[in-house]
Amino acid sequence: MSGTILENLSGRKLSILVGSLLLCQVLCFLLGGLYAPVPAGHTNVLGSLCRENHARQNDTSFFLYSRGEGSCTQVTREEVEQDSMKLANQIVHVFQMPLPRDSRVLDYSRWQQNLIGVLQVEFGYDSSSELREPPKELQLTIDMRLAYRNKGDPDHAWKLYAHGVEHRYLDCVAAHIGSSETLYTCDMIPLFELGALHHSFYLLNLRFPLDTPKQMNLQFGHMHDLTLTAIHQNGGFTHVWLMLKTLLFPFVVGIMVWFWRRVHLLQRSPALLEYMLLYLGGALTFLNLPLEYLSLTIEMPYMLLLSDIRQGIFYAMLLSFWLVFAGEHMLIQDSHNKSTIRSRYWKHLSAVVVGCISLFVFDISERGVQLRNPFYSIWTTPLGAKVAMSFILLAGVSAAVYFLFLCYMISKVFKNIGDKRTSLPSMSQARRLHYEGLIYRFKFLMLATLLCAALTVTGFIMGQMAEGQWKWNDDVEIQLTSAFLTGVYGMWNIYIFALLILYAPSHKQWPTMHHSDETTQSNENIVASAASEEIEFSNLPSDSNPSEISSLTSFTRKVAFE
């Protein structure tokens, strides 16, 4: 058996390969750290007060806007305070995005990919009113209308994007207690999420209807300032991200084709680890596929959901691969039967599959519904917020437990290797040099696997927390830097690229020795070559199981020979 490239590649060639891959890894970090802007940006938009047009109040094709020709009649804060009813049912809160800068009209770019809106509410209670403070879990009913227009359209040509009457629950605290009124400020509430930022301008009209028979919004005093925080992906980061995907995609596809071609040239069926490497490469290829280019010409509101699905498939495959990878190198083979998923790893992989399916169901329950109603959010109710927070915490804990279990498996691998190294002194010098070289290479690869797993788990936990921090309104601020994102993404590609090369079958043919004098001469040649950097870790004559892809996995069944 010729073994793998990891076993047969010379020390100098292996050093060049590892050095080149490490250089690529550094470049991925530098690309995000020096060239790319922060991944996401946000703008705070203070709502404008426009007087309601009662004749067209129920017309969903009519919108009030605060800038441009034909803008609404705006109401000042003083007018609201002087009115005994605080202009109830006569005010529309208007948010026009994006804001102008230095008297220049700005527009959104499709490179910014998506848009998320969260709302900060402030309201007050008069000292003379019967209700002095908001009740716990105060429910707010909001009539939301989201519209859009594009460059070149007239100022009044707003078109309906989505409309809904939604409920939000507020948790408020007193911000200022005065003689005439008490001002309350509330936690941020999720308002909308757009999976595609396809249009140039967006407009949001918010109404807070008061209805006594329906007991609608009667427990509020009167609204003060409403601040909308619009969060979007930075276009410059999208440029860098797509450039990285575009560069990596053909390399991974090419190395997969090369790897599978070498496997099929062998006179045996592919081993389990070779199948897992192919599946892992396929999942990475699906993740690398730069589908985001399509969103520059086609409106794809499902892009966020599709991105989550692609990343989820990759995570599931990567986590499964690491379990099989460590398990196949535990050097404990109870039988000569070929390893299969069903026979050896179904318990471990079942936990990974159940966890990934649970996260998929959680994701589809929110972003799937948002394809039809962008105002929907699982975080809008107290129960939903607790469930969502529990899922995030559970996902983080599960990722940490998985990493600890992987560390345990790899430690068992190292322990088994250490136990078997005690048999090396009884071997011939040639065989001892052969296996010592393999062990050093293998340990380096396993440590690289642990580092990759640690960064992957860290990135997953930070990503979950960063996504939820705008929704749970915690004081913890998490900013995933561009260098970390591009570095980890490049690391996945480089790591899998290296595995496909190093675990590809080596086609070097070594002569089989039949006589003791020939064997002695061969061993002397290997010992002599060990002093140079160009030592080739060839497979010594043995009765290895032909189904194994690495001679290291058959180490336990080797007998010392002189």
Curated annotation (Swiss-Prot):
Residues spanning the membrane: 14-34, 240-260, 271-291, 312-332, 345-365, 387-407, 442-462, 483-503
InterPro entries, per database record: WLS-like_TM, WLS_GOLD, Wntless
UniProtKB keywords: Cell membrane, Cell projection, Developmental protein, Endoplasmic reticulum, Endosome, Glycoprotein, Golgi apparatus, Membrane, Postsynaptic cell membrane, Segmentation polarity protein, Synapse, Transmembrane, Transmembrane helix, Wnt signaling pathway
Pfam name, any one: WLS_GOLD
Topological domain ranges for the Cytoplasmic compartment: 1-13, 261-270, 333-344, 408-441, 504-562
GO biological process: compound eye morphogenesis; cuticle pattern formation; Golgi to plasma membrane protein transport; imaginal disc-derived leg morphogenesis; imaginal disc-derived wing margin morphogenesis; intracellular protein transport; positive regulation of protein secretion; positive regulation of Wnt protein secretion
Subcellular location: Presynaptic cell membrane; Postsynaptic cell membrane; Cell membrane; Endoplasmic reticulum membrane
Cysteines engaged in disulfide bonds, as pairs: none
Location of region: Disordered: 538-562
Membrane topology, from the record: Multi-pass membrane protein
Sugar-bearing residue positions: N58
Domain of life: Eukaryota
Composition bias type Polar residues, residue spans: 539-556
Primary location recorded for the protein, binned into one broad class: membrane
GO cellular component: cell projection; early endosome; endoplasmic reticulum membrane; endosome membrane; extracellular exosome; Golgi membrane; multivesicular body; neuromuscular junction
Subunit structure as annotated in this protein's UniProt entry: Interacts with wg; in the Golgi. Interacts with Vps35, a component of the retromer complex; wls stability is regulated by Vps35.
Family: Belongs to the wntless family.
Function: A segment polarity gene required for wingless (wg)-dependent patterning processes, acting in both wg-sending cells and wg-target cells. In non-neuronal cells wls directs wg secretion. The wls traffic loop encompasses the Golgi, the cell surface, an endocytic compartment and a retrograde route leading back to the Golgi, and involves clathrin-mediated endocytosis and the retromer complex (a conserved protein complex consisting of Vps35 and Vps26). In neuronal cells (the larval motorneuron NMJ), the wg signal moves across the synapse via the release of wls-containing exosome-like vesicles.
UniProt name for this protein: Protein wntless
Gene this protein is translated from: wls
